[in-house]
Every structure is written in C-alpha cells, then in structure tokens.
C-alpha cells in the first residue's frame, strides 16, 4: 500500500515541475469512471489526512472546508507535458520551471473563503488569516 505523495510544489525551482501529480491522478481516474474519480479524491484528501492524524480532508459539518474545484472537461483535454516551460521569476531573481494547467482549477476555497477563481485572487487572500498550521494529532 502506498500513498500518493511526490509533489515538488516548486521547491526545486530551476529544473523540476512535478507539482501536478494530483491533477494527473484525477485525469487517470477520469478515464475509467466517475466512481474511480470519487475514490481518487478520497485517496488525495481524507486518506492522507487520516494517516497523519489531521482533522481535514472531508467536508463534514464544522470542518475547515478547503476546496479545490476542477473543470472535468478542461482536465480531460489538459496536456501536462505541453504546459511545462522555463520562465524568469523577478521575485527569486532566478529562472523557474513551471507546469501550466490553466483552466483546470476553476476555484479554490480556504476555510470556505474564495481565494482563487478563474485566474483571479480573492479579496480575502493576504488580508486575513485563512489557513492554519496543521499538526499531527
């Protein structure tokens, strides 16, 4: 038994862009069935949270409600290898390998607050504390 895990998340900014493993997992599941997508969502959310003893990963009443919404048609057409490019980041004064998935993720919510919608940041982002440090139970 294994747990999905390798997501670079931009830590290796020059030469790696493998932070789209979750989207690729959902795309593979999508090819099979809606039931397989449902199982994959569970594998990517509540199962890792339970393994690490975190009170997140589900949408039960009173939960934190971190949600990412994905357009299934855009995901189906998305080419993960075609979206990789090397760009220059002024912030880091360094080139960075990125993997574009424009349009796949349509909305992101942290604690129920919209922080991303179709390429635009939400008003709450950077102005109020939305998330929290997660510590194992």
Name each region found by the language model:
Residues 1-137:
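Active-site microenvironment of metallo-dependent hydrolases
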């Amino acid at each position: 038994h294994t747990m999905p895990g390798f997501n670079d998340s931009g830590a290796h900014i020059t030469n790696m862009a493998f932070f789209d493993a979750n989207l690729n997992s959902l795309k593979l599941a999508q090819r099979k069935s809606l039931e397989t997508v449902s199982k994959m969502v569970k594998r990517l959310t509540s199962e890792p949270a339970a393994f690490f003893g975190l009170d997140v990963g589900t949408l039960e009443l009173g939960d934190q409600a971190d949600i990412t919404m994905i357009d299934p048609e855009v995901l189906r057409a998305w080419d993960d290898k075609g979206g990789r490019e090397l760009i220059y980041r002024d912030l880091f004064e360094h080139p960075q390998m990125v993997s574009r998935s424009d349009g796949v993720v349509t909305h992101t919510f942290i604690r129920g607050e919209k922080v991303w919608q179709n390429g635009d940041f939400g008003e709450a982002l950077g102005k109020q504390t939305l998330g929290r440090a997660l510590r194992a139970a």
